[in-house]
């Protein structure tokens, strides 16, 4: 009986193992094919001869049809959408024909020769989607610095791959994200098994409020196999009840047909001449309805002109004022588009931010440039902001004249109102660190308790500054700056300083010198030395001082869009006189107009009291940041898919009477906002927490 049971068990186990063994062999064979094909895809771009890819010119045709399925008043808040947010129908079509010149570094320069559009005023709409039309399939990121490509070796940890063999030596490759995240895409491609060349490719994903479906036909020979010859895209945009659908088609590598002198011309005859594919019935109908409408409107305007009637609400308030208040204003000018100007929306709640010290801050930015030739350019910018918590308006106006491109020679004049500042003596007393030299009459912080909490401007000075700098680079490693800087400081409450026998106005005028060293050239660490020497009686100055600062900063870029930002610096005053009352460092100051996630690394301390910036005659600080698209929060279920970047912050500071001060932070970047959470430690003791956020919505639109 026992022997019978043993036979039954043995046969059962053997029967179970046979299909498992066959399945295992089949799976092993499938895995081997997948690994083999993916290795060839990962290596394909490095094996292609790219000779001739630079210094060449080609032409491309793009058409897109847009439909507003649902819309409401909030659509006018979306950049580039104001023109289609009211009236003007529901369907639109745009075509343009571009000249693309690739320089020696492989950077494309695009000039638009023809442009037809039924969008009012030929406005550019959903321009951010056009970035999806030229994906870098074999690169680390698909679209400029966004979306991790499944066909780059460093990103394979984020994808699962499956390969199905097809006839004629081809295979179908599927790539599935291991987690749901806006930095990853679902992918299907037809590839050649022998060398890993991609012939056809489809991507599906979501980024920056847009759901997209992309279908590519890749080039067939040489370096052209690294890019598409045709791209079809469907984009779905949804925002606060608005639903917009777009269909895009771009065809690349077209022959030259028109004169290169054409610049953004609206001509239906020329467009029909270069159009490589026919319009479908729906597209022809959109054009027909549009031109019929324009003809009727022209006749109505002729009648209105005779009757001298003007629709103030429609023509002025809605089209002009509303457009300029809620939409970006940008335009080029000059016969060959030598100049441009751009103004951020004047009134748009999406352009606000928040920080612990300044509360809600509204920001705006204006910039323009004109190029006389490759060497000579002039530019002007206006960057401003208003702090609702401080009830203060900040502005910075830089004007720059570039006169030598090879040596980065430029002359820059900058004017603005800086942070309000206390004298260093008042600042130290407000912080509770009174030194023998700080005697200033009968003043004591106990008279004004609110000073300790930073809630009064009773002792502060307003600051109006001017800065003129000439910059010159000797070679890729060495550069210098030479110029002049002036500060006019006027007491907010002059009567306070009159009472204690101190001046209520100070003016400093100082020559400045800077020396910059880049040991590894353009890419790598930047070391800079700055020296500023205030001279009494120079152009009306009444302060003598000397200040030196050393600064070192670098950003190390790693694979998978990771980066390490580091900045170290020190500064000190070398000369002091009887009226040496202001401590104002160049590289250690309170940033009065904070930017968004992509601002340059400035070494801000989020929770540090503003009094500390001008209480010590020396400082030593270090700031480090680690950034990556997927660290911790991206792996969370449900919400993790919306986190596009994450950061860790570590900042340290040593000043007189505060040794050390540290801040630790964690930041998140989503399509809507950037968030930062910080904890401060004062002399190794917990000193509080805080947060900061800024709107990121449509920042790249």
Region locations from a protein language model:
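Exposed, low-structure sequence patches enriched in small/polar residues
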Residues: 142-147, 269-701
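One face of beta-strands
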Residues: 58-62, 159, 185-189, 199-203, ...
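Short, conserved secondary-structure transition motifs
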Residues: 62-69, 235-241, 253-262, 416-425, ...
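Structured extracytoplasmic
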Residues: 24-170, 179-184, 248-346, 350-353, ...
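Glycine/threonine-rich ATP-lid/beta-loop region of ATP-binding domains
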Residues: 5, 21-24, 553-555
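Bacterial N-terminal signal peptides that target proteins for export
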Residues: 1-9
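Gly/Pro-enriched, hydrophobic low-complexity segments
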Residues: 162-267
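Bacterial N-terminal signal peptides
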Residues: 9-17
């Amino acid at each position: 009986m026992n022997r019978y049971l043993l036979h039954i068990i043995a046969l059962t186990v053997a029967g179970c193992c046979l299909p498992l063994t066959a399945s295992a062999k089949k799976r092993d064979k499938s895995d081997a094919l997948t690994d083999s094909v993916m290795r060839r895809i990962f290596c394909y771009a490095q094996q292609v001869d790219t000779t001739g890819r630079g210094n060449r010119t080609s032409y491309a045709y793009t058409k897109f049809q847009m439909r507003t399925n649902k819309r409401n008043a909030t659509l006018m808040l979306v950049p580039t959408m104001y023109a289609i947010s009211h009236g003007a129908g529901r369907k639109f079509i745009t075509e343009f024909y571009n000249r693309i010149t690739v320089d020696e570094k492989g950077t494309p320069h695009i000039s638009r020769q023809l442009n037809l559009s039924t969008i009012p005023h030929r406005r550019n709409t959903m321009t951010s989607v056009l970035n999806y039309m030229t994906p870098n399939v074999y690169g680390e990121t698909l679209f400029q610095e966004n979306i991790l490509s499944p066909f780059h070796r460093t990103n394979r940890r984020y994808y699962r791959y499956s390969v199905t063999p097809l006839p004629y030596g081809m295979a179908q490759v599927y790539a599935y994200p291991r987690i749901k995240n806006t930095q990853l895409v679902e992918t299907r491609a037809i590839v050649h098994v022998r060398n890993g060349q991609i012939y056809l490719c489809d991507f599906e994903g979501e980024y920056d409020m847009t759901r997209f479906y992309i279908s590519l036909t890749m080039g067939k020979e040489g370096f052209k196999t690294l890019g598409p010859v045709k791209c079809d895209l469907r984009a779905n945009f949804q925002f606060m009840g608005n639903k917009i659908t777009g269909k895009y088609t771009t065809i690349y590598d077209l022959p030259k047909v028109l004169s290169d002198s054409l610049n953004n011309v609206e001509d239906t005859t020329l467009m029909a001449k270069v159009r490589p594919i026919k319009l479908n019935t729906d597209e022809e109908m959109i054009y027909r309805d549009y031109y019929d409408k324009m003809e009727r409107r022209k006749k109505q305007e002729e009648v209105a002109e005779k009757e001298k009637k003007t629709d103030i609400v429609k023509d002025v308030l809605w089209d002009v004022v509303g457009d300029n208040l809620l939409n970006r204003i940008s335009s080029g000018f000059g016969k060959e588009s030598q100049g441009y100007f751009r103004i951020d929306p004047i009134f748009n709640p999406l352009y606000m931010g928040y920080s612990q010290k300044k509360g809600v801050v509204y920001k705006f930015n204006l910039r323009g440039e004109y190029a006389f030739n490759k060497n000579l350019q002039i530019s002007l910018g206006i960057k401003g902001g208003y702090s609702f918590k401080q009830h203060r308006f900040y502005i910075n106006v830089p004007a720059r004249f570039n006169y030598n491109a090879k040596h980065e020679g430029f002359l820059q004049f900058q004017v603005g109102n800086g942070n309000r500042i206390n004298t260093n003596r008042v600042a130290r007393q407000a912080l509770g660190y009174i030194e023998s030299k700080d005697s200033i009459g009968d003043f004591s912080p106990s008279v004004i308790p609110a000073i300790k909490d930073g809630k009064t401007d009773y002792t502060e000075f307003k600051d109006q500054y001017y800065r003129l700098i000439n910059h010159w680079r000797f070679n890729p490693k060495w550069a210098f700056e030479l110029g002049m800087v002036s500060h006019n400081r006027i007491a907010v409450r002059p009567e306070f300083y009159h009472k204690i026998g101190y001046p209520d106005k100070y003016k400093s005028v100082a020559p400045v010198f800077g020396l910059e060293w880049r040991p590894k050239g353009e890419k790598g660490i930047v070391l800079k030395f700055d020296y500023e020497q205030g001279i009494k009686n120079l152009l009306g100055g009444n302060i003598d001082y000397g200040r030196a600062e050393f600064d070192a900063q670098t950003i190390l870029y790693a694979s998978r869009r990771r980066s390490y930002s580091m900045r170290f610096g020190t500064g000190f005053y070398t000369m002091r006189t009887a009226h040496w009352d202001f401590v104002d460092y160049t590289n250690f100051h309170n940033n009065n107009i904070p930017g968004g996630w992509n601002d340059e690394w400035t070494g801000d301390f989020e929770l540090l009291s503003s009094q500390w910036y001008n209480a010590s005659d020396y400082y030593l600080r270090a700031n480090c940041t680690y950034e990556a698209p997927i660290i911790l929060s991206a792996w969370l279920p449900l919400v993790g898919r919306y986190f596009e970047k994450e950061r860790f912050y570590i900042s340290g500071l040593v000043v007189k009477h505060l040794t050390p001060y540290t801040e630790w932070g964690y930041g998140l970047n989503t399509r809507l906002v950037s968030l930062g959470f910080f904890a401060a430690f004062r002399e190794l003791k917990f000193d509080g927490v805080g947060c900061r956020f800024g709107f990121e919505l449509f920042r790249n639109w």
